[in-house]
């Protein structure tokens, strides 16, 4: 079982690196820029993106919006939406994309908000099941979203969210950018 998990992690990591390389190529060739807003993933997506040489030509930066204060006061998420739906909802990640694009002056943004788990006694997101993570990619009038709802433990939930976000971004760019020399 341990060897199987190691292989699975290796495959996931390699898959993410290859996708990041393709993202790099698409953004660089199309002279587009990217920013990130990460809550539960805490910078993992930015780390994957910046691990590719040349990412400084298109990646402007990222915001770790772990607290609702950062979501509302810096990235402009409507506090009423968080109060009504929690920070783990589609509307919040869409607003994070818009706020990130405005703040960082980017063409595209990736945003993630979720509850990776496990639940604790002082947890304010307990209304949301562990493993519930929303991802959004896009620009103000063209945002795609993805909801993850599988709890495999905190570490795997975060790794899965990072991988899914990278692939959602790659699919989005492939549909909207001029083709590059990618697989």
Which residues does each PLM region occupy?
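Short alpha-helical segments enriched in small residues
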Residues: 2-183
């Amino acid at each position: 079982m341990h060897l199987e998990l190691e292989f699975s992690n290796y495959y996931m990591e390699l898959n993410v690196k290859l996708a990041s390389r393709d993202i790099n190529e698409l953004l660089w060739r199309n002279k587009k820029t990217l920013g990130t807003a990460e809550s539960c993933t805490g910078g993992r997506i930015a780390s994957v993106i910046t691990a590719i040489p040349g990412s400084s030509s298109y990646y402007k930066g990222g915001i770790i919006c772990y607290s609702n204060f950062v979501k509302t006061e810096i990235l402009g998420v409507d506090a009423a939406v968080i109060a009504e739906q929690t920070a783990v909802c589609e509307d919040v990640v869409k607003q994070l994309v818009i706020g990130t694009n405005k703040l960082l002056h980017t063409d595209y943004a990736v945003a993630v908000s979720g509850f990776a788990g496990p639940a604790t006694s002082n947890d304010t997101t307990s209304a949301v099941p562990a493993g519930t993570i929303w991802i959004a990619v896009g620009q103000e009038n063209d945002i795609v979203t993805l909801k993850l709802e599988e709890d495999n433990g905190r570490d795997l939930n975060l790794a899965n969210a990072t991988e899914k976000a990278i692939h959602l971004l790659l699919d989005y760019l492939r549909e909207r950018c001029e083709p590059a020399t990618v697989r």
